[in-house]
Amino acid sequence: MRETVFPLAFRHGLVLLVGLLLAGCERPPKEPVQGGYRGTGMEQIYNPRIIESQAALNAEPKIARAARLRKDAPTAGETYENIKVLGDLSIAEFGRTMTAITAWVAPQAGCTYCHEEGNLASDGKYTKVVARRMFQMVQHMNATWNKHVGNVGVTCYTCHRGHSVPQNVWYKPATPRNEGAMTGQKDGQNAPGPLTGLAALPNDPFSDYLLGGNNIRVQGKTALREAELDAPRQGVKNTEHTYAFMMHISKALGVNCTFCHNSRSFQNWEQSTPQRLTAWHGIRLARDLNQHFLTADPLLTIFPANRRGPLGDVAKVNCATCHQGAYKPLYGSHLASYYPAVWPKELRPEIPPGPPPEPQTYPAVRAPRTQ
């Protein structure tokens, strides 16, 4: 009897174990896309089902018809009160921009999400002060960080996608209760979370690289400590933080490590793909926004408690804030070229006359092959 019960229990246990091991895996099919010399692992692995599910998220919003330009038309700054950023726009273009930002950021709440009803000029709502600063931030990105955003540019919709608060922001994690006890502190490890692809790596891979000014470093290349200028940043602990951050980038862009790195030598820049340089600028772009806009006045002090993290810090950006699972936000949509307000005055594009183009719902777009 025992010989019969034991094998049966063993088989049931084995089936349960296999089920648990496979629960974290994506079900097929998988589609590899070669991005380098064959047989070297230089490829991207895509799941067509997941790619298709992202199509709606990365579809362009409706583009409003461009305002008709008149040389003698008064500007918004000459007509309305308390216009501090977009005052040089025509009244028609200013109204078009306000309509667009309402649809991009607060489609449910409408104009009163930022404005006081009956007194649109008032700065009484903190959201209006935030929106003004966000316009300055977007213009700064489009003017200064073309090495990352290229000539495509960004808009409010790039991050918000119809939500008043972007769905992918980060706060500093709360300190565990046993922090500083006899067992020491875990440095955020062994607490898998979505920010690091559910890995047991440090759960705050952003404070060092996207808020602080630290450079990415891994373990040293020799057995003994290297007498280099940046050697203090090399070691196992720094490697763990680096890999946590790399997991985030991979998940945020929906790509493998070899999208940026060469499989035979991850650290070698000469053998890396062109995307690695774009990512290098992207890291510094996010750091710039976090340091000089999101954690600086007036935003640092104006956000209420319900818009702050567990440690009281404000929301900050990372790679997923814009990319949201796509190797290019909105798969490279040129939405910004139809809205002059998101560019500084000297860089504003001319909007072609006539009806606007129909919104593009991009197909299941994969990252291109590396040349």
What does each of the following model-derived ranges do?
Residues 2-113, 118-371:
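N-terminal export/targeting leaders of redox proteins
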